[in-house]
């Protein structure tokens, strides 16, 4: 077990996550994928599947879309969260395997572990940690690792 200071959703923790409630889902989840900005993050070790983020990438948060809670490419005509940002919070993203198999409409989307702001601002439902802690845990995790949120 490894504990790290983090920030969670503005609405706190919940066992009954709903789209837009600003809450972080409780549970044990695997990490599905690492997304990273290769123009900003160059040195790290990681044993899970990874993909570099480009300016056309987003994550669908529209429950009415067939792409709900999935990686998308812009242009996209439904609601989605941009992944290529000026600020650094999405320089590293571990996609938490929440509401993915199967995807349940309105149960919540885009639940990530990402980089925290300097003052550890609350998130919209994600978990955020310091960049140095993020890089450290990347070398420790595999496709069998689970994050426990409680």
Segment roles from a protein language model:
Residues 1-124, 131-150:
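Cell wall/extracellular polymer interaction/catalysis modules
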């Amino acid at each position: 077990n490894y504990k790290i200071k983090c920030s969670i959703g503005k609405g706190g923790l919940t066992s009954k996550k709903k789209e837009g409630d600003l809450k972080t889902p409780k549970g044990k989840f695997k990490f599905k994928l690492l997304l990273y900005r290769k123009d900003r993050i160059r040195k790290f070790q990681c044993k899970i599947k990874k993909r570099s983020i480009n300016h056309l990438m987003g994550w669908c948060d529209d429950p009415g879309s067939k792409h709900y809670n999935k990686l998308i490419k812009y242009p996209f005509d439904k609601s989605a969260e941009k992944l290529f940002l000026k600020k650094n919070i999405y320089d590293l993203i571990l996609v938490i395997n929440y509401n993915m198999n199967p995807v349940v409409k309105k149960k919540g989307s885009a639940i990530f572990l990402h980089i925290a702001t300097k003052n550890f601002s609350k998130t919209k439902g994600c978990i955020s940690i310091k960049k140095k802690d993020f890089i450290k845990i990347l070398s420790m995790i595999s496709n069998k690792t689970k994050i426990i949120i409680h």
